[in-house]
UniProtKB/Swiss-Prot annotation:
Residues found modified as N6-methyllysine: 264
Bias kind Basic and acidic residues: ranges: 79-106, 118-145
Stretches the record annotates as Disordered: 79-145
Name of this chain's protein: DnaJ homolog subfamily C member 17
Keyword Transcription: yes
Organism of this sequence: Homo sapiens (Human)
Positions of the RRM domain: 178-249
Residues modified to Phosphoserine: 112
Entries under SMART domains matching the protein: DnaJ
Length: 304
């Protein structure tokens, strides 16, 4: 029986279902079992039964002949080794391909990262430039506000000097009225009443009533003009008039008028005038000392 080339391309051991080292007895036994199962007479409806039966017969012919089997095993081994080499080569090619694809992906990712970094850098540079421009505008605005504040403070100092050219610091007046120690109404002059009487002449900075000396108070005006108007015009309550005299900040012309008025029966006594002159010569810092002293007297209370 001639063996076809197509049969040699097949795995005869696998066709019979036996091991490569199977003995002739095992080969024949396997052939009988396979041949019976696929005999054309038993499988009339299977068109491949005759072909398979023919292949089994050829396999038996090759594997039961020692020389033919040895030649077949040699060819089979060579084909197997070639297949293994091809598989290894395919695996190597596959690995090379995978490595190449991985490097390409890595290169693309790196390029993408570089592009993203470049975009981020450009964005950062733009933001820095924007902040620099906005910072310059803000700096200019702050410097403008500082210059404006300095100008306003300078103007205020100039106005304050103009208002107090003749006096020392802010003007302060001494207020006196009749009041008995046991008089709870304080002679009709509470702090609110005095403020209502005096604030119509100008801003009142401080007003301190002495509890140790009933009927006595000190008022501090913001301007000399307001103090002058109060001295010249305020008389207080009709049934209990106020006596108003200068303590600090009295203009020179007002001092002259007060001095000449004393010789003509002014309401100021000689003692009040001397006290007025001494107080006018004090520095502006004594204002706080005077107020603090009177507040301390109020806290201590009247002597027993």
């Amino acid at each position: 029986m001639a063996v076809t080339k197509e049969l040699l391309q097949m795995d005869l051991y696998a066709l019979l279902g036996i091991e490569e080292k199977a003995a002739d007895k095992e080969v024949k036994k396997a052939y009988r079992q396979k041949a019976l199962s696929c005999h054309p007479d038993k499988n009339p409806d299977n068109p491949r039964a005759a072909e398979l039966f023919h292949q089994l017969s050829q396999a038996l012919e090759v594997l039961t002949d020692a020389a033919a089997r040895a030649a077949y095993d040699k060819v089979r081994k060579a084909k197997k080794q070639a297949a293994e080499r091809t598989q290894k080569l395919d695996e190597k090619r596959k690995k090379v391909k995978l490595d190449l694809e991985a490097r390409e992906r890595q290169a693309q990712a790196q390029e993408s990262e570089e592009e993203e970094e470049s975009r981020s850098t450009r964005t950062l540079e733009q933001e820095i430039e924007r902040l620099r421009e906005e910072g310059s505008r803000q700096l200019e605005e702050q410097q403008r506000l500082i210059r404006e504040q300095i100008r306003q403070e300078r103007d205020q100092r100039l106005r304050g000097k103009a208002e107090n050219t003749e006096g020392q610091g802010t003007p302060k007046l001494k207020l006196k009225w009749k009041c008995k120690k046991e008089d709870e109404s304080k002679g009709g002059y509470s702090k609110d009443v005095l403020l209502r009487l005096l604030q119509k002449y100008g801003e009142v900075l401080n007003l301190v009533l002495s509890s140790k000396k009933p009927g006595t108070a000190v008022v501090e005006f913001a301007t000399v003009k307001a103090a002058e108007l109060a001295v010249q015009n305020e008389v207080g309550l009709v049934d209990n008039p106020l006596k108003i005299s200068w303590l600090e900040g009295q203009p020179q012309d007002a001092v002259g008028r007060s001095h000449s008025g004393l010789s003509k029966g002014s309401v100021l006594s000689e003692r009040d005038y001397e006290s007025l002159v001494m107080m006018r010569m004090r520095q502006a810092a004594e204002r706080q000392q005077l107020i603090a002293r009177m507040q301390q007297e109020d806290q201590e209370g009247p002597p027993t």
